[in-house]
Amino acid sequence: MSEIRFTNLTWDQVITLDQVLDEVIPIHGKGNFPTMEVKPKDIIHVVKDQLIGQGIIVKDARLNGSVASYILASHNGISYKDLDVIFGVELPGNEEFQVVKDAVLDCLLDFLPKDVKKEKLSPDIMKDAYVQKLVKVCNGHDCWSLISLSNNTGKNLELKFVSSLRRQFEFSVDSFQIVLDPMLDFYSDKNAKLTKESYPVVVAESMYGDFQEAMTHLQHKLICTRKPEEIRGGGLLKYCSLLVHGFKPACMSEIKNLERYMCSRFFIDFPHIEEQQKKIESYLHNHFIGEGMTKYDYLMTLHGVVNESTVCLMSYERRQILHLITMMALKVLGELNILPNTQKVTCFYQPAPYFAAEARYPIYVIPEPPPVSFQPYHPLHFRGSNGMS
């Protein structure tokens, strides 16, 4: 029996989709640049028309990832941060990449406040002022670009232009995409009204393959995937985020292999400690703004998974990344003004160099942060002097 990848949205899901597309999202400018108030349905429509006008072939526009999952199962407590939009386009060469970037930056001018003088605002100026992240990938398997628009609360509007992408999901619960073109056409009709008797047919697809199976995983908050060896390094960070938000492995007998794959891939893609730190900090910034204790729980969960399932590192590399995660977690506690209780912390002390010639060493305490032992998957909660835990 073949898998069914598609389904039509119900009336309630279409209403949720309409609310998401009609919500005003602020795009914050750097420095003295003003904040733009943008509705997703407007910018998606304008960008699509601009690309077509510039000769770019646009197959469709879709909502992707956590926002699509939210629309399908918002009643299950599913939430989202970023609003990910995928434009299916043809990008045969570098020239088309440049056309896409310039078209998007030009569209942003339309959303500036009316009193702003736009004549001297070049694409480069708009990029520096409003783009948080600009990515271009073109290799044997993947050909896509990403323009992420800045939002200080972490609710970034991410526009992704995909010509080819070997893998478009990490886990079944984030494999959903919702085709937006019927809604865009509906919005273009000024006389159309969204009613239960008359609403557009909107299709959702699971890139995982079996839509109903993926939907069951989403409804029951289960972690499952296919071909884990294809998951890139960021999959480890997403996996730990799912754990922190109440998701559980669908199959406990397979989860250790999955964790080992993800840990190995993370350290292959980010081999140096500086890269690892940058990647983790970026993930925290994008997904945990204003969520201090959740951020702390996330770091402790990441610590547990790395500690239990990393098999590809030398001993000193392993200690290095675990120490980094621990220090990041303690920094979060410091920002929350929560002081750790050290009564149950095991400390190991290094004897001073001038005792090296002695056969027996006395124990001295030196002012260095001691190693801290954490249990995997069960984040520690230090009890502070202010009563918080």
Curated annotation (Swiss-Prot):
Keywords: Nucleotidyltransferase, Transferase. GO terms for biological process: mRNA stabilization. It catalyses: RNA(n) + ATP = RNA(n)-3'-adenine ribonucleotide + diphosphate. It is an enzyme of class 2 (transferase). Changing residue 312 to E: Does not affect poly (A) elongation activity. Decrease about 50% the poly(A) elongation activity. Its EC number is 2.7.7.19. One of its GO terms (molecular function) is poly(A) RNA polymerase activity. restricted to testis. It comes from the Eukaryota. Changing residue 158 to Q: Loss of poly(A) elongation activity. SMART domains: DUF1693 (SM01153). Catalyzes the transfer of one adenosine molecule from an ATP to an mRNA poly(A) tail bearing a 3'-OH terminal group. Belongs to the TENT family. This is Terminal nucleotidyltransferase 5D. It comes from Homo sapiens (Human). The gene is TENT5D.
